[in-house]
Amino acid sequence: MTTIVSVRRNNQVVIAGDGQVSLGNTVMKGNARKVRRLYHNKVLAGFAGGTADAFTLFERFEAKLEMHQGHLMKAAVEMAKDWRSDKMLRKLEALLAVADDTCSLIITGNGDVVQPENDLISIGSGGNFAQSAATALLENTELSALEIAEKSLTIAGDICVFTNQFKTIEELNY
């Protein structure tokens, strides 16, 4: 699977992801880019789950962002409604972590939209490791959101066999 982590602190939001693509117990690719900028570079998005499924979701989510002029919450809720009602989408196995300058959200494979506490998101096979590390760093250091995301992803990659050390990191400063 993968690890995606998003951290918000001091007018900065970051989404970071590793690059490993696995098929069963085999590493197929080590430098996949699972974090992207959407809607005129104003929205960050990362995915965990099936790669083809995630690209389908990225396309649909970007269309919703365009439809709602970049309003993240409205686009996410509309995407979730589609996910629940569209037979094809219901079969997609992926999670999206999305963020802009106002909020951070998880869009789940069940069609749920979750705004996490503390604006900390972690999804994927190494998500619990990354979340634990990021929580400790948020509570006990003055590191930037970028530094916390990078360090927590490194820790997850050291522990989770489905997460590697190749990182894609996108940040928004506001």
Curated annotation (Swiss-Prot):
Q: Which domain of life is it from?
A: Bacteria
Q: Activity regulation here?
A: Allosterically activated by HslU binding.
Show the InterPro entries listed in the entry. ATP-dep_Prtase_HsIV_su, Ntn_hydrolases_N, Proteasome_sua/b, Proteasome_suB-type
Instruction: Give the matching PROSITE patterns.
Output: PROTEASOME_BETA_2
Q: GO:BP terms for this protein?
A: proteolysis involved in protein catabolic process
Chief localization class? cytoplasm
This entry's Enzyme Commission designation comes to 3.4.25.2
- Enzyme active site: T2
Tell me what reaction this enzyme catalyses. ATP-dependent cleavage of peptide bonds with broad specificity
Q: How does it assemble?
A: A double ring-shaped homohexamer of HslV is capped on each side by a ring-shaped HslU homohexamer. The assembly of the HslU/HslV complex is dependent on binding of ATP.
The family annotation for this protein states: Belongs to the peptidase T1B family. HslV subfamily.
Query: PANTHER family from the xrefs?
Result: ATP-DEPENDENT PROTEASE SUBUNIT HSLV (PTHR32194:SF0), METALLOPROTEASE TLDD (PTHR32194)
Report the HAMAP family cross-referenced here.
HslV
Name the NCBIfam families for this protein. ATP_dep_HslV, PRK05456.1
Sum up the protein's function in the record's words. Answer: Protease subunit of a proteasome-like degradation complex believed to be a general protein degrading machinery.
Specify the protein name.
ATP-dependent protease subunit HslV
